[in-house]
Amino acid sequence: EMMEQCPDSLMWSLCDGKLENATARTSFDAMRAGDQAAAKVVDTYIRYLACGVVNLINIFQPEVLCIGGGVCNEGDYLLKPLLEIVHNEQYSRHSVDQTAIKIAELGNDAGIIGAAMLSL
């Protein structure tokens, strides 16, 4: 949606001018290069992700919540704002026991490893 509104966005050249080629990486790469439209996309993405994470924490109160997928390779560009929003929005923000939010260690191999373990 933002790309359609901003035809001069760097995101277009990063995805070869085809909207269907745009990924989360496209937005993060363009944001790091100073593209304001991409920065808005990343901010919106992080806010939606934080909403889901906060809901999971508030409902299930897990000790650890793992986040996976390719977007986790963005490191602090993803985690710092995500953790700040989650900390401010979760019900248990003043509790001694806080949910640890971690990047899944298996990365993009998690699905295939899980499928292999299922057959055992």
Give the predicted meaning of each segment.
Residues 1-120:
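ATP-binding/phosphotransfer module of carbohydrate and carboxylate kinases, centering on a glycine-rich
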